[in-house]
């Protein structure tokens, strides 16, 4: 049984999604002013949302990418969480996720860095991947952290970016981070999984209405950041479910049972099992896509505690 706070959250986000979907257009249709409006509106939610007590923010630059550093008195300055925000690669920013990462930093006892990576449709792939790699290397080369002090992760499209950044770092032969924590990751941009259907779209209060509009117009959400002529579904640096996760660090996955992207996480879990990659997997009953965005729910607080416990196990013990 989900909490009363979660029940109220679902009601609120149904209204939010209805409002957003009434303005939403598919990647091939959307205009610059609509994109600008969505970005402003979503950023506003993170700015006005609650923050953990004593939250400190600082604007820094990692590998040439503007980044928001977030910490609280509980944050360990030697334990770093490089967190890529979600938003379908078309919206979202450190501002939109400020409330979320404030509580995440506080409860997981980490110092969180949120890159303001380039978005589509203005910036197409591989701009996002380049920024993901640059920010990780910036923590090492510019700030002096060791890879063992760094965890990476993110929600939705940010989870995708964490995965493809990991696979790119592996190809480059760079020392990998200590672990990954993925929140409702968009691991399958092709939308080919079992949960991509009308029933799940009706159950997913956050992105279901948007995806039904995309399907209706025979479009693909990934067109926000990849041009059709550049799509290669066998390229693991675009579509990470085609990748190999042997010799990768431990990976944690959290996903809601009521989200359209449920099969993304389920398939990723099977791949990690296939490749012998240490992992922890949690399905949150009754929860919607990136439920963590609502920090008023006890489910969110417990999810952040799960993340903190997972990261703790894989950071150096003396840091």
Language model features with spans:
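A glycine/proline-hinged amphipathic helix-loop "lid/cap" segment
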Residues: 1-75, 227-232, 317-319
């Amino acid at each position: 049984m989900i909490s009363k706070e979660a029940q109220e959250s679902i009601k609120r986000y149904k209204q939010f999604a209805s409002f957003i979907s009434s303005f939403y257009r598919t990647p091939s249709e959307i205009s610059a002013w609509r994109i600008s409006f969505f970005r402003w509106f979503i950023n506003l939610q993170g700015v006005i949302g609650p923050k953990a007590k004593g939250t400190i923010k600082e604007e820094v630059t990692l590998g040439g990418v503007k980044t928001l550093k977030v910490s609280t008195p509980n944050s360990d300055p030697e334990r770093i969480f490089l967190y890529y925000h979600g938003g379908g690669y078309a919206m979202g920013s450190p501002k939109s996720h400020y409330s979320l990462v404030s509580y995440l930093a506080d409860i997981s006892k980490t110092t969180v860095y949120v890159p303001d990576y380039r978005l589509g449709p203005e910036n197409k792939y591989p701009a996002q991947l380049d920024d993901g790699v640059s920010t990780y290397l910036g923590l090492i080369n510019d700030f002096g952290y060791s890879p063992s002090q760094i965890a990476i992760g993110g929600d939705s499209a940010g989870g995708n970016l964490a995965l493809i950044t990991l696979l790119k770092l592996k190809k480059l032969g760079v020392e990998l981070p200590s672990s990954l924590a993925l929140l409702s990751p968009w691991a399958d941009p092709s939308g080919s999984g079992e949960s991509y259907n009308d029933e799940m779209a009706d159950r997913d209060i956050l992105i279901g209405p948007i995806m039904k509009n995309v399907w209706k117009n025979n479009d693909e959400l990934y067109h926000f950041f990849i041009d059709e002529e550049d799509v290669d579904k066998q390229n693991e640096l675009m579509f990470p479910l085609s990748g190999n996760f042997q010799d990768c660090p431990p990976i944690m996955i959290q996903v809601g049972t009521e989200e359209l992207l449920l099969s993304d996480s389920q398939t990723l879990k099977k791949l990690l099992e296939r490749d012998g990659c240490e992992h922890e997997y949690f399905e949150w009953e009754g929860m919607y896509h990136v439920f963590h965005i609502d920090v008023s729910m006890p489910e969110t607080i417990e999810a952040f505690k799960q993340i903190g416990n997972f990261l703790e196990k894989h950071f150096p013990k003396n840091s």
